[in-house]
Amino acid sequence: ASPYGTEVCGMIASSLAQAGITVVSGMAFGIDSIAHTSALDAGGSTIAVLGSGIDNASMTPREHEPLGRRIDGPKGLIISEYAPGSPATKGSYPARNRIISGISQATIIVEADIKSGSLITAKCALDQGRDVYAVPGSIFWPRSEGTNWLIAQGAHPLLHIEEIVERINGTQPSLLESPVNPAPNNDSLEERIVTLLSQRGPLHMDAIVETLTCSAPEA
């Protein structure tokens, strides 16, 4: 992970943990381990989903055995669909990503190059009807190429950590939810957009369309 990714991931995981939200990741090098560690350091809970068996002989990476012992405590949980003694394979990591997204209310991609397995997790999340957030990054940085691409494809850009905390805790509607029988509003579309942005801060076009039930060309 880059210094930028490390700082952002730490802030996100800590904020979620302090809000009582469980952080789920894959206990791999980089962003995964930062997410788990930051959640635990903040006094929160975390779940690690492995692409191998959960026994010491199979768990990978071996360098993360101390982290695994820390997660496997009062505030954490390690799970796997693979039996003890099953080593990680090239295909087991992408396969476990569907579990990471499946047990999560939202998926956040902090850093990813264009071929990153994190993009598989994002696709799984969309297929499962979950919200997908991506952290924007420099157009010159390869590890932001995947996240910037996700945003271009419609993922919600994560600009304010408070936004996802509020959404997961239920004080904001899911990006995938459409308003049910919204009350009539006589304000002009422009006034409604200004009001919405003043209440929630910067929003992706898709979120504006979903919230105001207008078409993209109108917005």
Question: What do the PLM-derived regions correspond to, one by one?
Answer:
Residues 1-219:
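Glycine-biased, small-residue-rich flexible motifs in mid-sequence functional cores and linkers
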